[in-house]
Every structure is written in structure tokens, then in C-alpha cells.
Amino acid sequence: IQELGLPERSEQECLTMIGLRLTEAPAKLFPELDLEPDLYALTYRRLFNEYNVEGAVELYPNVVETLTALKDRGLVLTIASSRSNASLNAYIENLGLSHIITYVLGGNDVQEGKPHPEAVNRTLRELGFQPEEAIVVGDTVFDIHMGRNAGTKTCGVTYGNGSGESLADADWLID
């Protein structure tokens, strides 16, 4: 925001954009301005690559153990993210999740971003599942709406970017 000389926004306002594509966030964050979304996205990616170092993102406690237990019980675990494929796959590898996650769909793989159901629908189709056999777990309202729009059950996790209030539309909440 500073790099582009845009009006200051609060941390809370910026956090509400997490989950949206970088090309969609500017119009929501700065509706009064006529911004070039590609310039915003390119600037964000440049700064992200400059400041994002291995170890900058940490998993919450017990995540690997929980996901491993779910996989051991026969659940198929996938990730659909608006994050670029390159950074998403790097995170999965660096965080030691590669052996747990069956299928990964990044923002580059879909035409429509969250909350559109394209990512969920494509994942279900690729893996041969029906919506009623799936649960979308997420920490933003966009994740929950994506799951709802795809006809799946949804589970909001409040220890990420969302609050119980913002995730109230989820079928279940985990604190």
C-alpha cells in the first residue's frame, strides 16, 4: 500500500482481503479509487518474494499430527488456495506437508477466485468425489462461501484469519 502511495488502511481492513485474488482485493480495499489490479498484484508479489523467507510461516501446534491422523483414517486431504502455485507448493514442501496432501490447486489453476466454487468443483471432479462427501475447511469467509457455493459442508477455523463472527455461516467452527 505504501509502495503504491495508496491511502492507509487498518490491519483489520487488510486482513479481510485474505483469501481473495490479488487482482480482486484492490477494488474491495479501495472502492473509491480506479486502481490497476495487475500493478497491485505485481507489486505485492515482488514484495512478498523479497520479504518471504523460509521459516517465516509456521504451522499451528499439532497440525501435522492432526492431518496425519485424518489421512490415516482414510480421508483425502487437498488444498485449494488463491496463493500462486509456486509459493503454495514451496510452503507445502517447507512445512513438511507433501506426504499428507493428495491434491493441490493454486490460484493459477482456476479462472474464478473465491468465493466462486470452481476450485472445489474441480478438485471434486479430479478426485471423483461428490459435494456431499466433502468438507471445506477454511479461516476466511471466502473459504466458507466457496464451500457453500459448491454444495459441501463447511468448517471454519477461528485461530487463523477469521473470527467466530466472520465464520458464522460455517456448518462447524473450531477454535
Model-derived segments and their meaning:
Residues 81-83:
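Conserved phosphate-coupling serine/threonine residues in phosphotransfer and NTP-handling enzymes
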Residues 7, 98-102, 130:
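Conserved H-loop
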Residues 64-72, 124, 144-149:
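Surface-exposed amphipathic alpha-helices with a cationic face
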Residues 1-64, 69-73, 86:
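N-terminal helical cap/lid subdomain that shapes the substrate entry/recognition surface
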Residues 69, 73-76, 102-103, 133, ...:
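Structural signature of beta-strand start/N-cap positions in the alpha/beta core
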Residues 135-173:
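Acidic, Mg2+-coordinating phosphoryl-transfer loop and its flanking beta/alpha structural elements
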Residues 113-144:
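Conserved Lys-Pro-Asp/Glu-containing loop-to-beta segment of HAD-superfamily phosphomonoesterases
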Residues 17, 42, 98-112:
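A short, structured active-site edge motif that brings together acidic residues
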